[in-house]
Regions:
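Non-cytosolic beta-sheet module surface loops
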Residues: 17-20, 31, 54-56, 68
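Short, surface-exposed loop/turn motifs with a glycine/proline- and acidic-biased composition
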Residues: 43-68
Length: 80
């Protein structure tokens, strides 16, 4: 469905995009070992690309998890 948040990545950030406002959204970045590199609770406005900075992360593969209540999206991305 179109209301699910979508994830995009460039060299400096991972972006959360949603067509509807997402309140009390928890965004976390962890590595494969479970170490937490980023954690925040925020609101993503409708039709906005919300940037989560990744430029300072060490090279490797990470999980980006997004939770809102019982709904969640987990994505994987790599930093070179």
């Amino acid at each position: 469905n179109n209301s699910s948040p979508r994830l995009f990545q460039d060299d400096s950030s991972v972006y959360v995009y949603s067509e509807k406002e997402l309140d009390n959204l928890t965004i976390g970045i962890t590595d494969m070992m479970g170490n937490v590199y980023h954690y925040e609770v925020t609101t993503v406005p409708a039709c906005t690309y919300y940037a989560v900075p990744i430029a300072s992360l060490p090279a490797g593969t990470y999980y980006l998890s997004i939770y809102q209540g019982s709904n969640y999206v987990i994505g994987m991305f790599t930093v070179n």
